[in-house]
Amino acid sequence: MQAPGRGPLGLRLMMPGRRGALREPGGCGSCLGVALALLLLLLPACCPVRAQNDTEPIVLEGKCLVVCDSSPSADGAVTSSLGISVRSGSAKVAFSATRSTNHEPSEMSNRTMTIYFDQVLVNIGNHFDLASSIFVAPRKGIYSFSFHVVKVYNRQTIQVSLMQNGYPVISAFAGDQDVTREAASNGVLLLMEREDKVHLKLERGNLMGGWKYSTFSGFLVFPL
């Protein structure tokens, strides 16, 4: 028996001889073994395995995607090339209006019973119209509204309703005859569609003494 030889990768290779004895491989056998080993090492690099094909969706996990668009849609949403809808900074909506004088209601106010305001404190998005004192929703979402209507030097009980598209949603009352100023106050969360309208209406009593210091406020909690 001949002494064992070393093949590729440092392995000892023995080959059978004429009478069943083991012999070392020849030079050609060693070259063939080295070539096979190199081929096995290079095969993964030459033929990579594709995890996804081009038709599979791209999944982003734990990544922050920033989408910039100079012309967002009317509802403040931007759609990226990946089909992802992203709300832009212009989607913020909030308003707050107040009454700064005690002027008596105009003829229009007496006819429609709309409670008007004459000063805007906040109007982000410009969706509150001061002239009509009506807020128009720019998009579907959940909105928060609150109001405080002060009756001044008026002994009549008043009822103030928050109107959504012409229908009363909530009301508040003020009727204490022993105070010179009293407020009818309330607040609510509303589900609104795009272009829904909200305003305040005097359902009962009058504001002939004025309603200075009254406020009407609202903002978008989140879009849907």
UniProtKB/Swiss-Prot annotation:
It is found in: Secreted. Residues 1-51 form the signal peptide. Residues 88-224 form the C1q domain. Acts as a synaptic organizer in specific subsets of neurons in the brain. Essential for long-term maintenance but not establishment of excitatory synapses. Functions as part of a trans-synaptic complex by binding to postsynaptic GRID1 and presynaptic neurexins. This interaction helps regulate the activity of NMDA and AMPA receptors at hippocampal synapses without affecting synapse formation. NRXN1B-CBLN2-GRID1 complex transduce presynaptic signals into postsynaptic NMDAR response. NRXN3B-CBLN2-GRID1 complex transduce presynaptic signals into postsynaptic AMPAR response. Homohexamer; disulfide-linked homotrimers. The trimers are assembled via the globular C1q domains. The trimers associate via N-terminal cysteine residues to form disulfide-linked hexamers. May form homooligomers or heterooligomers with CBLN1 and CBLN3 prior to secretion. Once secreted, does not interact with other CBLN family members. Interacts with GRID2, and more weakly with GRID1. Interacts with NRXN1 and NRXN2 long and short isoforms produced by alternative promoter usage. Weakly interacts with NRXN3 short isoform and not at all with NRXN3 long isoform. PANTHER family: CEREBELLIN-2, CEREBELLIN-RELATED. This is Cerebellin-2.
